[in-house]
Amino acid sequence: MLNPTYLQQIRSQNPLIHNITNVVAANFSANGLLAIGASPLMSAAMEEMHEVPRLSQALVINIGTLMGKEVDAMVLAGKTANEVGIPVVLDPVGVGATTFRKQTVARLLKEVKFAAIRGNAGELATIAEVNWQAKGVDAGSGEADLAQIAHIVAKTYQCIAMISGATDYLSDGEHHAQIHNGTPLFPKITASGCLLSAVCGAFLAVAKPEQYFDAMLEACTAYAIAGELAAQGLKTTQHGQFYVGLLDQLAHLSPETINQYARISYE
């Protein structure tokens, strides 16, 4: 059983989460952070990257609609965040789709220390250099062991690795968990994974480094449960209602609800 504490800390501390994210996800991510009690700051201007991370409690880097001028800003923000000691989350959206994305993520992983890397199976398989047929920015398909992919990424980059999907896989290289909550409606709305990465940033913001695995586990479980509850009673075509309902459920989440619905297995 989880011992949910980080959600309440977010609501009491209202951490500022710096997001360098994509144009598709920015609004949804900002509203989702507000729903859980965090405060979003969306900035990708190179001129601000020495300052904004110093004002923030976490940084989330998302390469979803990557533009060349943003890469240097991402690196500088990441280095500044490392310097001041706040956690950095990487969402390597579509990293396997193009050479530019692969090169960008390789540079980020070389120059920035990440507390967590969160993506779908295809994205983390690319980072782990495991064969997988990714489909653009979507997960695609493959036969690899997802738990092993998460383990490889976690060990290689000394971080928390999280793979989102029908089952979520979490690893810090030593501890491993699978989250069995969620809904098939998640991939039916754009930026649901991007919002999860932002939520992970908020949970890490109120945790100490030695608590990052537990914070990520609570973040991903809480988010999956919010989606599960938002989908109750909806038809598979009611994407708009799910979109709004997810924000509502994130705002209504409580530690009691998380414990009531959590379905987690450990390895």
Curated annotation (Swiss-Prot):
Binding annotation for substrate: M42, A191
Superkingdom of source: Bacteria
Catalytic reaction(s) noted: 5-(2-hydroxyethyl)-4-methylthiazole + ATP = 4-methyl-5-(2-phosphooxyethyl)-thiazole + ADP + H(+)
Catalytic activity, EC: 2.7.1.50
Cofactor: Mg(2+)
InterPro entries: Hyethyz_kinase (IPR000417), Ribokinase-like (IPR029056)
GO MF term set: ATP binding; hydroxyethylthiazole kinase activity; magnesium ion binding
Positions of disulphide bridges: none
Similarity field: Belongs to the Thz kinase family.
Role played: Catalyzes the phosphorylation of the hydroxyl group of 4-methyl-5-beta-hydroxyethylthiazole (THZ).
Name the UniProt record assigns to this protein: Hydroxyethylthiazole kinase
Organism: Pasteurella multocida (strain Pm70)
Gene: thiM
